[in-house]
Amino acid sequence: MNGSGGRQMQCGKKADDKSLLARFFHADRSLTAVASELDSFDGRAEPDRCTRLVSKLRLNQDKVLAITNLIMEELLGEDRDPRAFRAKFPEEVLQENLAGQLWFGAECLAAGSSIMNREAESKEMRPLAQAVTKSLGNVRVLLRDQCLRNNVPNSKTLQLDLNDSTTEQLYESLKIFDRLFAEFELSYVSAMVQVKSRHEYEMQQWIGVLFSETLQRALKIGLLDQDMVDAFDPGLMFSIPRLAIVAGLVVYAKGPLNMDMPGDQLSEMFRPFRTILIKIRDLLRNLNHEELYQLEKVLCTNEDINAKAPLGSSSIEAPSPEHSSHHPTTSSNNNNNNGDTTGTTNTHRTVERLVDQRNNNNNNNTSSAPALDKAANRSPSMLSLSPNSTPTASPAPSPTPSHSIASTSSSATGSTHPPADWSDGDDEDEEDDDDDIEVEEEELDSTDDETDEEQLLKDIVAADCASGYLIPNTNLGNLLQPQEVPLTDNFVASEDDEYGAGEQQRQRHRDGQEDEPSTSAAMLAASRTLQRLRLPSSDAEPLAEQSTIKTPEQEQDQPHQSVYRHRHSHRHHHRHHHHHHQRHHHHQHQQPPQPHPHRTTRSGRKRCSLDSTESEATQPERDREPSQASGDTSAASSLSDDVSLAMRNTTARLKFKSTENLLHRLFVCIAGVADQLQTNFASDLRQILRSVFLMNMSSAQEEIDIPEKTKESELFEFRASENDVIQESAGSNQSIYSAEEVNPELDNVFSAGSGGGSPGNGNQANASAQRHSAGGSIQRNNTVDDGSPTGGGALLATSRSHVMRSRSLGDQESASTSTSSSQLHQEQQQLQIQVQRQRNNSVGSNTPSSASSTSSSSEQNSPVSARSGSRRRLQSNNETQMPSSATVTTTATATLAPPAWIPDGKAPRCMSCQTPFTAFRRRHHCRNCGGVFCGVCSNASAPLPKYGLTKAVRVCRECYVREVRSGMSVQGVPSVQERLTATAS
């Protein structure tokens, strides 16, 4: 007992012992003292004292665990439990005091406490927490015993007795504690923050690929600029996620944003928004090329939607020239005159107006059956209308009805590429049909033009279109449902549901009762179905024919083909409806129509392969019809499913009364989802965007910006010659110049100063000589006249050379930025003393205070001293003040480069109080020295004119005290005697 107490006293006396065991002994004793004090009083009675002691307890726990970790590194070595799971942790979790937080959490859980809102996880971790605290207590006892047995003062390594049983017991106890502590770390951190799985990491990589592909596509179509990527434009952090949502839903539909996959397979970043993304996808599929481009442009620029901008009429892009060249009807139709094209264009507007008029009449319950029958007799496009039709929206009547019905109907017929078997030998009917519809248009134009234009203007300036884009406190799901449509998770129906819907659809056709909007929905449905035939597989067509997005130049190459396909598909849509309603209204033909057995099974067009379409395009149509009839019959049910889905998507678009309203809602929802990623997944988004920027930078920029910035002393450094060494009052650290200082062509400041100092005869030769000669600028006995222009130039050259030397040598002499800043201050103070000595010993100066009026530093630019000095010069020697004032003005604008900031990763603790940084104790940089400090040690602010910072900025306390003192002594603050002298004069 006495021996043990003696060893404890002996170990306790040597507090300066730096060995691991001694350091552990003192840290453990301090921790025990704090814990005992905490247990000695009621924390509820003295909350302030309790809080202070708890903070001290956690600091001591950090210290004990840090030393224990060093001991385990030396004793266990490779036997330590692996901690590869830390790669899953977010950046903000991996702090230096993580071990102390884990120990504190384990003690709280072992005592019966629970993590807030994590009761289930706390209950599961409680046995493990109890095992951790018990194992750690055993390790502490064994380490204290080893401190008293085998401690070697100031030993760099542990020198334990390997033959002792206690050493082996310590070894096994450390292994058990290391394993338990690693398990508890993974469990505790996983309960507190989201930890990624392997699948999540893979999905995050796919999200990065999607972002990169989106950026490349945006650069290709002109939405973004390469200079923005090279400059790391902050605006891209918002633009790229928004564009990625659009591209992932409609362009790269089979990528990581494939909404058809199960929800648990989506990335955790987009999993909370799955329902709203499905609705966004369905609406995006109804946009044509121009509308999609306009939406993406708005997502990049946040500009208002241009209501008068021409919107495209096709949601399905025109086929490529190679594909369309196989159709003889298309090539022959390209030779038509402009009158035929004009007639087809008029057909568009006629159908749009009739459909829009039908919807408005049905919505107001004022339409009558005779009126509908009359309209049906006039135009085949109205044969599918019936009093039982129930529209889902009431768009305003207009030539382009607020872009809702017009865009829908024209999108269905604009540039749809029909299969080859759609040419039924009825080309001769088309001219008669066009003439009949043109008559209808002429009758409507005379009465509706003025009313339509006024209504269109009202729709454009509607409140919901002109409102701002940022809508706070908005449910994103409700934004996409302007009508009474419930929001459900089962927005996309399954295959069985779609099949059942198709059967009901066909039954309603047979019964003559149609509930869906007939004309516009059916027209769009068939064209949507045909477009899906062209998109899914890359083996059937070239990539250019599959893409849902093409440049406007590609679509403008084939105007006549698009016009023909518009009219041709329009005829077949009408005949399709005529057949189901048993209303065949044929016009007069030049020859009897050919029989069409395949018309009864027109829904089977989906199964026709594209290869056979191209090969059969050159064959006569009559030879092709019988062979396709059987194939059409076998695939009739498949097309009905797609038709029902397309009609449902079209119905969703019809709920918006204008295209501007639809684009506005899409903007709000897409921007809302993308901006939520900035908040909820900031760390993941930063990593993804950083990778995307690095992958898509230009090669020249990559070579310049990726390497770390090199110090000026490393870039411009050479050995000085004998002429460059200062003769008097100079140290060895002032014998090296920078390359910029030696090169006279780069010395713009000096040239301006010498020119300003001598407006009559600027002596450039003397200025250059004084820049490179030490004797002419700094020697003590050299005489410089106040009125001489070379005197001002010499002082300016002296100031500049000292500033540049201090700047280049400050980084070279010390590794710490704060040390270089203090050396810079000392250099400037020595410069002021030398200038004052030079001015006092000069012949032309009669007053010792003249130096205050010709300061060569921006810190001496005091209005009071300059005014008093100029008055004294006028009274003493009546000399001009222009050289001196020019020198002051010139040097006042010459500022230093701000110091380089110490990286956050190299400063785990405050450089003043040595307090470790945490997620709550943030880092702050001093603008004067570049050091990293906590908020308490850097709560001062002061202007730094030497760096060009005239406003107060954050500085540490040491720099603040130094700047205030130097400002009082260097900046020329007048004394009481000087103020009295200036007042008397």
Curated annotation (Swiss-Prot):
Amino-acid positions noted as binding Zn(2+) 2 in the UniProt annotation, renumbered to this chain: 926, 929, 956, 959
Q: Is Zinc tagged as a keyword?
A: yes
Quick one: which residues bind Zn(2+) 1?
910, 913, 934, 937
Give positions of the FYVE-type zinc fingers: 904-964
Q: Which residues carry this modification: Phosphoserine?
A: 537-538, 808
Record-stated family = Belongs to the lst-2 family.
Function description:
Negative regulator of epidermal growth factor receptor (EGFR) signaling.
Residue ranges annotated as compositionally biased, kind Polar residues, are: 776-785, 875-885
Disulfide bonds, paired cysteine numbers: none
From the Swiss-Prot or TrEMBL record, give the protein name. Answer: Lateral signaling target protein 2 homolog
Q: Taxonomic classification, please?
A: Eukaryota, Metazoa, Ecdysozoa, Arthropoda, Hexapoda
Q: Which domain of life is it from?
A: Eukaryota
Where are stretches of biased composition, namely Basic residues?
563-589, 596-607
- Swiss-Prot/TrEMBL keywords: Metal-binding, Phosphoprotein, Zinc, Zinc-finger
The annotated regions of Acidic residues compositional bias extend over 423-453
UniProt GO cellular component terms: early endosome membrane
* Record field: compositional bias (Low complexity): 327-348, 384-393, 401-422, 629-640, 761-770, 812-866
> In Gene Ontology terms, what is one molecular function of this protein?
zinc ion binding
The ranges of region (Disordered) come to 310-453, 498-520, 533-640, 747-892
